[in-house]
A protein has these predicted regions:
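Structural motif
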Residues: 27-28, 53
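Short glycine/serine/threonine-rich phosphate/pyrophosphate-binding segments
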Residues: 32-38
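Glycine-rich beta-strand-to-loop/alpha-helix junction loops that act as flexible
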Residues: 28-30, 170
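ATP/NTP phosphate-donor binding region
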Residues: 1-24
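Oxyanion-binding "anion nests"
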Residues: 134-175
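Conserved small/polar residues in nucleotide/adenosyl-binding loops
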Residues: 176-180
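A glycine/threonine-rich phosphate-anchoring loop and its flanking beta-alpha core
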Residues: 38-129
Length: 180
């Protein structure tokens, strides 16, 4: 869970293991792991390097890219955080073979949003993708395209003052219905 208690346990593990300002934290998991791990790295010893290895579709196309890190606090989602981009994001789409339907479609919905805000070709490819009979080679290409859409927007607006707000489309309503 993205809580202060979990964050403290990550800091404690880093400290106990003798991590220094030159250490590297590897975040392997879904969006909760990349958000919390990124924030732990951004704040431990005033910032250590970290890489994200996302294992869910949503984490691949959203949470692990763009540098928004944080935890939930006082009942509010992502209330405490920092803009701290990962040193690297390693995407291995083989992890997607392990996803259940719910987790697949939560990531696919994010990809559809990227298609809406990018170009008609990407949008058409996403609409033509057969989610009932997943072609993982095609999905790998679509993931790469969605990541590029997000990276292009983040590069233009790293601190979410303008165009990057388009990436929040749907998040405001969804935050009220999704679990912490």
């Amino acid at each position: 869970h993205k809580t202060l208690e979990t964050l403290a346990s990550v800091w404690m593990a880093l400290s106990t293991q003798g991590a220094t300002r030159h250490s590297l934290l590897i975040n392997l998991g879904g969006g909760m792991v990349t958000d919390l791990g990124g924030f732990a790295a951004a704040t431990f010893k005033r910032g250590i390097s970290y890489i994200n290895i996302p294992t869910t579709l949503l984490a691949m196309v959203d949470a692990s890219v763009g540098g928004k890190t944080g935890i939930n606090f006082n009942g509010l989602k992502n209330e405490i955080g920092a803009f701290a981009p990962a040193n690297s994001v390693l995407i291995e789409t083989e992890f997607l073979r392990t996803l259940d339907t719910h987790n697949f479609f939560s990531g696919y919905a994010e990809m559809l949003k990227h298609g809406l805000i990018s170009n008609t070709a990407h949008w058409a490819e996403l609409l033509n993708f057969d989610s009932s009979n997943i072609d993982y080679a095609a999905l790998k290409q679509l993931v790469g395209q969605s990541v590029q859409v997000k990276e292009d927007i983040v590069e233009q607006d790293p601190f979410e003052h303008g165009i990057r707000k388009a990436l929040n489309l749907g998040h405001t309503c969804l935050l009220y219905t999704s679990p912490s």
